[in-house]
């Protein structure tokens, strides 16, 4: 089963790892992980590491935990490869769920079948709020959700 997920993945935290773990449970080695291009990542308010470093961090996580090198692609537009490739599943967070609905709407307009959306709940930090890259960058929590 072909599975996709995407994101900026910076810094790579427990919430990201949960998304990757769910994708691998669904698709095994047949996963495509989209990592946003530097241009797309720079559209965010906070600074992020270059694409090559972010992609390498994701690859390293999968290789260490699962023993294989995942397919990693650069996302240069909001849809990534989801309009071109017939994925079975699209793994998303609550933050990216609306975009997943737009992807399926666009796929329908193109005469393609919808992708099954798998929404993975937030990973909560010690304070009961979601772990997020923004909160980590602000120094509120660490990558594991611990209060700093």
UniProtKB/Swiss-Prot annotation:
Superkingdom, natural source: Archaea
UniProt-listed InterPro entries: Cyt_trans-like, PPAT_arch, Rossmann-like_a/b/a_fold
Pfam families hit by this protein: CTP_transf_like (PF01467)
EC numbers on record: 2.7.7.3
UniProt subcellular location: Cytoplasm
GO terms of molecular function: ATP binding; pantetheine-phosphate adenylyltransferase activity
Keywords on record: ATP-binding, Coenzyme A biosynthesis, Cytoplasm, Nucleotide-binding, Nucleotidyltransferase, Transferase
SUPFAM superfamilies: Nucleotidylyl transferase (SSF52374)
Predominant localisation class: cytoplasm
Pathway: Cofactor biosynthesis; coenzyme A biosynthesis
Reactions catalysed according to its record: (R)-4'-phosphopantetheine + ATP + H(+) = 3'-dephospho-CoA + diphosphate
Signal peptide extent: none
Enzyme class (EC, first level): transferase
Gene Ontology BP, a term: coenzyme A biosynthetic process
Annotated transmembrane regions: none
GO cellular component: cytoplasm
Function per UniProt: Reversibly transfers an adenylyl group from ATP to 4'-phosphopantetheine, yielding dephospho-CoA (dPCoA) and pyrophosphate.
NCBIfam families listed in its UniProt record: cyt_tran_rel, PRK00777.1
Protein name, per record: Phosphopantetheine adenylyltransferase
Organism: Archaeoglobus fulgidus (strain ATCC 49558 / DSM 4304 / JCM 9628 / NBRC 100126 / VC-16)
Lineage: Archaea, Methanobacteriati, Methanobacteriota, Archaeoglobi, Archaeoglobales
Recorded name of the encoding gene: coaD
């Amino acid at each position: 089963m072909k599975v996709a997920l995407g994101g900026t993945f910076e810094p790579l935290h427990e919430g990201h790892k949960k998304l990757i773990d769910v994708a691998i449970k669904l698709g095994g080695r047949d996963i495509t992980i989209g990592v946003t291009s530097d241009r797309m990542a720079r559209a965010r308010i906070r600074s992020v590491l270059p694409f090559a470093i972010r992609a390498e961090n994701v690859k390293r996580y999968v290789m260490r935990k699962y023993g294989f090198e995942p397919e990693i692609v650069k996302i240069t537009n909001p849809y990534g490869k989801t309009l071109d490739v017939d994925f079975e599943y699209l793994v998303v967070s609550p933050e990216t769920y609306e975009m997943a609905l737009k992807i399926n709407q666009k796929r329908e307009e193109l005469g393609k079948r919808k992708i099954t959306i798998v929404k993975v709940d937030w990973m909560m930090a010690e304070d009961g709020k979601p772990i997020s890259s923004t909160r980590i960058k602000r120094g509120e929590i660490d990558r594991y959700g611990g209060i700093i």
